[in-house]
């Protein structure tokens, strides 16, 4: 193992009273909550792209971060060093999983053949490092949006040859994900959308991406991949409008192409913000539609119209999110992947640890608070009582299709229904009592 982060041996749990900045205050991996350990509930992962690939650049300035592997003249040698340092970080942080795009781990090269050679070389290395460290792959994916060839989309591109190139990348990334024991495969349509309707055929592009997803499902079954396929919703950026706008939009797409039993969603907090939703809303919607798959844990800034990908730091927001997950039975193959990056001014390499440690503690404390809410059943009792009438004779007849509009119009003549309080203020006080105890 490399010793790039030589000031740290391993991040450990020291409890809430610890003042050690390189220790967990709330994340105790083996602590049992609602019958499962914290590690089993959260299934934490570090993302390769923001953590090991980003150099600190933005739209207004070049990279600000000093990363040795980004200075090497040989791209493949740089990728090998990056893998060494990545697994040092993962091991010292003590997380069980990581995630990657194909071109995060290996250089794309100057041809498809070179891309395949480079990718397979690094997959060999990752397979060995996983075996040595015990760190596993939560999910893999293909980057079909950064290369200029994808400026007009990948699956939705007007050129079928570019569609074909994207399919080839997904083919390789899916095969690698299976080989590495990945538990999910993610599809994020970074440029599957439009800049202007003036040059866009919406029906055609929808049919193209629908067929693309059907081919992905076909390949999953052909190679015997037992993991979960996930689409990651996002409303815009980099395109003006993206076709996977939010969870509800994705569900409508899946239904149209007969994929609702094959694909679930990977929900990112910042993408919910961009779509004008709360993180809790997107999770609750996915759970209600039976497509909740995995989580990209981060936060956005409601005052900014772009993806800031900051580390999550709100116990309130994440308690409500995890409460919805626990009510839905928890995550199965999914987990909490930190799709988050340090700030451009955070130039100390150890800032990577501070960002992840703080975020992990936020999720751990949020899990404790949400679990208590589930355990006490107080909130659920209020909801159950609110809808209790639907368990009665009238409600059951309506839901069972045994009543018509005409029959209900007749029944209404003998009714004098009265509304009851929604108790929102009381419920919000209850929730605050759990969060800030």
From Swiss-Prot:
<dbReference type="GO" id="GO:0009045">
    <property type="term" value="F:xylose isomerase activity"/>
</dbReference>
<keyword id="KW-0413">Isomerase</keyword>
<feature type="binding site">
    <location>
        <position position="339"/>
    </location>
    <ligand>
        <name>Mg(2+) 1</name>
    </ligand>
</feature>
<feature type="binding site">
    <location>
        <position position="296"/>
    </location>
    <ligand>
        <name>Mg(2+) 1</name>
    </ligand>
</feature>
<dbReference type="GO" id="GO:0000287">
    <property type="term" value="F:magnesium ion binding"/>
</dbReference>
<feature type="binding site">
    <location>
        <position position="271"/>
    </location>
    <ligand>
        <name>Mg(2+) 2</name>
    </ligand>
</feature>
<keyword id="KW-0119">Carbohydrate metabolism</keyword>
<feature type="binding site">
    <location>
        <position position="309"/>
    </location>
    <ligand>
        <name>Mg(2+) 2</name>
    </ligand>
</feature>
<feature type="active site">
    <location>
        <position position="104"/>
    </location>
</feature>
<feature type="binding site">
    <location>
        <position position="232"/>
    </location>
    <ligand>
        <name>Mg(2+) 1</name>
    </ligand>
</feature>
<dbReference type="GO" id="GO:0005737">
    <property type="term" value="C:cytoplasm"/>
</dbReference>
<keyword id="KW-0460">Magnesium</keyword>
<comment type="subunit">
    <text>Homotetramer.</text>
</comment>
<dbReference type="InterPro" id="IPR013452">
    <property type="entry name" value="Xylose_isom_bac"/>
</dbReference>
<feature type="binding site">
    <location>
        <position position="307"/>
    </location>
    <ligand>
        <name>Mg(2+) 2</name>
    </ligand>
</feature>
<keyword id="KW-0859">Xylose metabolism</keyword>
<keyword id="KW-0963">Cytoplasm</keyword>
<dbReference type="GO" id="GO:0042732">
    <property type="term" value="P:D-xylose metabolic process"/>
</dbReference>
<feature type="active site">
    <location>
        <position position="101"/>
    </location>
</feature>
<feature type="binding site">
    <location>
        <position position="268"/>
    </location>
    <ligand>
        <name>Mg(2+) 1</name>
    </ligand>
</feature>
<dbReference type="InterPro" id="IPR036237">
    <property type="entry name" value="Xyl_isomerase-like_sf"/>
</dbReference>
<protein>
    <recommendedName>
        <fullName>Xylose isomerase</fullName>
        <ecNumber>5.3.1.5</ecNumber>
    </recommendedName>
</protein>
<feature type="binding site">
    <location>
        <position position="268"/>
    </location>
    <ligand>
        <name>Mg(2+) 2</name>
    </ligand>
</feature>
<comment type="similarity">
    <text>Belongs to the xylose isomerase family.</text>
</comment>
<dbReference type="InterPro" id="IPR001998">
    <property type="entry name" value="Xylose_isomerase"/>
</dbReference>
<keyword id="KW-0479">Metal-binding</keyword>
């Amino acid at each position: 193992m490399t010793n790039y982060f030589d000031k740290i041996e391993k991040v450990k749990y020291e409890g809430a009273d610890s003042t050690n900045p390189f220790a967990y205050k709330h994340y105790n991996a083996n602590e049992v909550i609602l019958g499962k350990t914290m590690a089993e509930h959260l299934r934490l992962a570090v993302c390769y792209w923001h953590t090991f690939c980003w150099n600190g650049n933005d739209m207004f300035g070049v990279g600000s971060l000093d990363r040795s592997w980004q200075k090497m003249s040989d791209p493949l040698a740089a990728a090998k060093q990056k893998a060494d340092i990545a697994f040092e970080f993962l091991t010292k942080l003590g997380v069980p999983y990581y995630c990657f795009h194909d071109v995060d781990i290996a250089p794309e090269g100057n041809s498809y053949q070179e891309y395949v050679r480079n990718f397979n070389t690094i997959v060999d290395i990752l397979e060995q490092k996983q075996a040595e460290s015990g760190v596993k792959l939560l999910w893999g994916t293909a980057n079909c949006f950064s290369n200029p060839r994808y400026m007009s989309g990948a699956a939705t591109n007007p050129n079928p040859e570019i569609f074909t190139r994207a399919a080839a990348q997904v083919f390789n990334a899916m095969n690698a994900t299976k080989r590495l024991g990945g538990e999910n495969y993610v599809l994020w349509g970074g440029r599957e959308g439009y800049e202007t309707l003036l040059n866009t055929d919406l029906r055609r592009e929808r049919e193209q991406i629908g067929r693309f997803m059907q081919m992905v499902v076909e390949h999953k079954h052909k190679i015997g991949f037992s993991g979960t396929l996930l689409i990651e919703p996002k409303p815009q950026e980099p395109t003006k409008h993206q076709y996977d706008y939010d969870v509800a939009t994705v569900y409508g797409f899946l239904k149209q192409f007969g994929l609702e039993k094959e694909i679930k969603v990977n929900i990112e907090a910042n993408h919910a913000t961009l779509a004008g939703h709360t993180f809790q809303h997107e999770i609750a919607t996915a759970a209600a539609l039976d497509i909740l798959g995995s989580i990209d844990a981060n936060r956005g800034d409601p005052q900014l119209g772009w993806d800031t990908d900051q580390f999550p730091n709100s116990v309130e927001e994440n308690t409500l999110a995890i409460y919805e997950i626990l009510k839905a039975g928890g995550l199965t193959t999914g987990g909490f992947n930190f799709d988050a990056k340090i700030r451009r001014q955070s130039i100390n390499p150890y800032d990577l640890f501070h960002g992840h440690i703080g975020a992990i503690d936020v999720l751990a404390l949020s899990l404790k608070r949400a679990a208590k809410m589930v355990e006490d059943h107080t909130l659920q009792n209020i909801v159950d009582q609110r809808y209790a009438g639907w368990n009665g004779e009238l409600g059951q007849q309506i839901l069972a299709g045994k009543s018509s509009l005409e029959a209900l119009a007749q029944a209404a003549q003998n009714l004098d229904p009265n509304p009851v309080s929604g108790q929102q203020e009381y419920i919000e006080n209850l929730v605050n009592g759990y969060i800030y105890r």
